Swiss-Prot record:
Originating species: Arabidopsis thaliana
The protein's required cofactors: heme b; Ca(2+)
Protein name, UniProt field: Peroxidase 18
Additional information: There are 73 peroxidase genes in A.thaliana.
UniProt enzyme class: oxidoreductase
Active site annotation, chain numbering: 71 (proton acceptor)
Top-level taxon: Eukaryota
UniProt cross-references to CDD domains, sorted A to Z: secretory_peroxidase
Binding of substrate, residues: 164
S-S pairs: 40-116, 73-78, 122-325, 201-235
One GO MF term attached to the UniProt entry: lactoperoxidase activity
Gene Ontology biological-process entries: hydrogen peroxide catabolic process; response to oxidative stress
Gene from which this protein is expressed: PER18
Length: 329
C-alpha cells in the first residue's frame, strides 16, 4: 500500500526515515546513523556546540547555514563542493556571492581535526550544521545518517542550472526539484526554510516601485499592498540594495515555525517564488495544510530535509575526507 503524504495526524517517525533511507540508492545504503560512533564519537556534539556558540554572537548565522546546505546539495549533491574556494568554483559564482556561514563550518572542521584527524567529512559537517541550526531555532530534530565523502570537483558553471532564482515560476521550480528526485510536496515543505533568514533588497525589489510622486506602485499584484509598503521603507533608495537585508519572515524571523505559510495566505511572501506557491493549485493546497498545522509541517520537514541531505552523496572512493573544507586535498 502506498504511503499517503498527508493525513489528519501524520506520524512520521525515526522508523519512517529509516525506511526512506533503505529505499534510496546503493550509495546511501553505505551511510548510517552511527557512522562516527567508533571513529569520532563526539563529532555530532562538536558540530552542535559550535553552531550554538556561533549563533550566540551572530544569530543570523543559523539562517545562513540552512541556506548553505541548499546551495550545496542542489549542485551535484551533498558533497561539500560549495565550500571550496578558488576561481571557477561554485563558491565564486555570483549566484553564491551572498552565501554565509563558511566560518562556522571551518571552525567545526578545525576542532574535529584536532580530536579526530582525517575522519569527519565537510559534507557531513555541513548537513549536520544545517540540521542543528533548525533545531536551535525551535524546529524539529532530524535524524541524519552520516558517512558522506567530500567531492573533489567544484565548478561555477554547475550553479545556475541547478539553483532556484527568486523569480522562478512554479513549473520551473518543480522541474528542478524533480530532477533531484524531489516532489511537489518537497518543494513546498523545503520552501518553509524561508521562515528564518534574511534576503538582500535586490532579490525582491523588482516586485514594486515608486511612481514619480513617490507613491507605491505594485508590479506584482500578488503582493499585499501594506507589506509592499513596509518593504519599500526598509529598502529605501538611499540604501544599497545589494547589502541591505530584510527578514524573510516579517512575523517570527527568529523562530523556525509554520508562520511562513501563514504569511503566504496573507500574500506576504517576500520572493516571487514564495507568492507563486499560492497561485498554483498543486502547491496552494499544501501551503494551506501546513499553515494550519505546525506539527504536520515539522513532520514533513523531517522527511523532506532528510531526502535532500541524501541527494548525490559520495561514498568510498567517490570522494575524500578533506583536511580543510575550503580546499581539496
Amino acid at each position: 500500500m502506498a504511503l499517503q503524504f498527508f493525513s489528519c495526524k501524520p506520524k512520521y517517525t525515526f522508523l519512517s526515515s529509516l525506511l526512506l533511507l533503505l529505499l534510496l540508492s546503493s550509495s546511501v545504503a553505505e551511510l548510517s546513523f552511527n557512522f562516527y560512533a567508533g571513529s569520532c564519537p563526539g563529532a555530532e556534539l562538536i558540530v552542535r556546540n559550535t553552531v550554538r556558540s556561533a549563533s550566540s554572537s551572530d544569530p543570523s548565522v543559523l539562517g545562513k547555514l540552512l541556506r548553505l546546505i541548499f546551495h550545496d546539495c542542489f549542485v551535484q549533491g551533498c558533497d561539500g563542493s560549495v565550500l571550496i574556494r578558488g576561481n571557477g568554483t561554485e563558491r565564486s559564482d555570483p549566484g553564491n556571492a551572498s552565501l554565509g556561514g563558511f566560518a562556522v563550518i571551518e571552525s567545526v572542521k578545525n576542532i574535529l581535526e584536532i580530536f579526530c584527524p582525517g575522519t569527519v567529512s565537510c559534507a557531513d559537517i555541513l548537513v549536520l550544521a544545517a540540521r542543528d541550526a533548525v533545531e536551535a531555532l525551535g524546529g524539529p530534530v532530524v535524524p541524519i545518517p552520516t558517512g558522506r565523502r567530500d567531492g573533489r570537483v567544484s565548478m561555477a558553471a554547475n550553479v545556475r542550472p541547478n539553483i532556484i532564482d527568486t523569480d522562478f515560476t512554479v513549473d520551473k521550480m518543480i522541474n528542478i526539484f524533480s530532477s533531484k528526485g524531489l516532489s511537489v510536496h518537497d518543494l513546498v515543505v523545503l520552501s518553509g526554510a524561508h521562515t528564518i533568514g534574511a534576503a538582500h533588497c535586490n532579490t525582491f525589489n523588482s516586485r514594486f516601485k515608486l511612481d514619480p510622486k513617490g507613491n507605491l506602485e505594485l508590479i506584482d499584484a500578488s503582493l499585499d499592498n501594506s507589506y509592499a509598503q513596509t518593504l519599500v521603507n526598509k529598502c529605501s533608495s538611499s540604501l544599497d540594495p545589494t547589502t541591505t537585508v530584510v527578514d524573510n519572515d516579517p512575523e517570527t524571523s527568529s523562530t523556525f515555525d509554520n508562520q511562513y505559510y501563514k504569511n503566504l495566505l496573507a500574500h506576504k511572501g517576500l520572493f516571487q517564488t514564495d507568492s507563486a506557491l499560492m497561485e498554483d493549485d498543486r502547491t496552494r493546497k499544501i501551503v494551506e495544510i501546513l499553515a494550519n498545522d505546525q506539527e504536520s509541517f515539522f513532520d514533513r520537514w523531517t522527511e523532506s530535509f532528510l531526502k535532500m541531505s541524501l541527494m548525490g552523496v559520495r561514498v568510498g572512493e567517490e570522494g575524500e575526507i578533506r583536511r580543510s573544507c575550503s580546499a581539496v586535498n
